[in-house]
Amino acid sequence: MRSIIYVIMATMVSLTMGTGCAQAQDKALDKTTEVPKVYLIKEISSENLIKIYEALSRKAEGNVAVKLSTGEPGGHNFLQPSLIAPLVQKVKGTIVECNTAYGGGRANTEAHLKAAADHGFTAIARVDIMDADGETSLPVKGGKHLKEDFVGKNYLDYDFTVVLSHFKGHAMGGFGGAIKNISIGIASSGGKAWIHSAGQTKDISKVWGNLPPQDDFLEAMAEAAKAITDHCGDDILYINVANNLSVDCDCDSSPEDPRMGDIGILASLDPVALDRACTDLVRLSDDHGKIHLIERIDSRHGMHTLSLIHISEPTRQEAIS
């Protein structure tokens, strides 16, 4: 059976307009701006990861960072190395991560590299824990909560970023996809605390007992993502794999088992359109198990970051074989 690529058209044209926070008041929406596309292939395979990457028509060149989650020890839903290896190797990518801010098995570089090795990632590519030698900051233009985003120092060594995200639920954000992966994921350990506290502290010993209102955290996460998109310009692309759809993130050492079936591989040059497409497909699914993931998303107000985005009805195109 030949794969089908769905091209989902969105009226949202930028992360700025989509989040409703960073620079939302900057400019009116330009009606002539190109509408972003989201591609979907239902069958999840290494071959189709490469096919959907090529459909984006944006070549990853130079020193390429592949941002993904190596998964917390004890977890099992993260993207498997056997699935992603051909794509990572095709782009000659380095798998990049930053240390966590909540303790656990990836809170320092030595433990994080061990987790990456135990999960099979070091066998397919070089793994760079980008904040092993410190952090640097990127400006957040027009941010409500953040004026700068603290990222792993080594991130500046890369020319292009392939954002390869496992779409699933998340205990704090409601769901995790491309936006979470480039915001909290690229943030240093202290930068993660900075986002979670909506710009109040980088001290990981203080953040968890003094969390801000939920919407402030979600807006800060969007602002940090905007810092990454501004930094990268056109040297970035986004792929979400919507499988193992647990309500819990890959940062959870004991995630709940998925209650609904896999959706497929989605890709876009626009992270907001991509994450919105994933959440739409969860809601449109005929799988009764979706109620658990929807409850997780909505109970955390997870759509707040995407609340100004309006996705039109999907159109279909047959994939090039």
Question: Each PLM stretch: what is its role?
Answer:
Residues 7-16:
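Bacterial N-terminal signal peptides
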Residues 320-321:
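Hydrophobic alpha-helical segments, chiefly the membrane-spanning helices
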Residues 1-5, 278:
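Positively charged n-region of N-terminal signal peptides that target proteins for export
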Residues 30-85, 90-308, 312, 316:
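Extended, low-polarity segments enriched in aliphatic/aromatic residues
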Residues 22-26:
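Boundary at the C-terminal end of the N-terminal hydrophobic targeting segment
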